[in-house]
Amino acid sequence: MSLLSIFGCGRAKTPEYPADRLSARDGTEFTITFFKHASLAISVGGKYIYVDPVSANADYGALPKADVVLITHSHYDHLDVAAVEKLLAADTEILCDRTSAEAFEMNCYTMRPGSVATPRDYVKVEAVAAYNTTPGHLQFHPREREDCGYVLTIGGTRIYIAGDTEPTPELKAL
């Protein structure tokens, strides 16, 4: 028996993460893959949208390149520039909140609550307010920071990405 047969072929296997395969209202199929904490990916027809990529949550160098990257806010557990850089292709679109935009030395589209963007023909992105309302948490996500959650529309189906937020009046409108 050779060492290769005992230990495999010598290549690391890409880790598998929990994923849900869904169909949008118009029949478009998409998959939501959860990595950890706030990091996830949505794949639509071989295109990938990554949300809050953080290196501690996934091996982004082993994953497909991003079509779109969404960043909700600049805290370390939601924004990791090194992870984003591993996902970049020549035409990757990065959408992020105002404070995260300051962390990038690359082009990104700054989103504020109320902003709407269509970075690709298969997805519309609406930025919604994400802030804390309870006294013990106000210092982490004050409303004036303009942190973002996102509502993605894919094939007529809306997907809410919360970011870090608590119940707010804006959530009732969703």
Residue ranges and their predicted role:
Residues 95, 99-102, 166-174:
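Cap/insert and terminal regions of metallo-dependent hydrolase folds
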Residues 81-82, 106, 137-138:
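Short, conserved acidic/polar surface loops in the N-terminal third of protein domains
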Residues 3, 7, 12-64, 110-173:
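Core dinuclear metal-dependent hydrolase active-site scaffold
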Residues 85-86, 90-94, 98-126:
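Non-globular, low-confidence helical/coil segments that flank catalytic cores
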Residues 55-100:
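Active-site metal-binding motif and surrounding structural segment of the metallo-beta-lactamase
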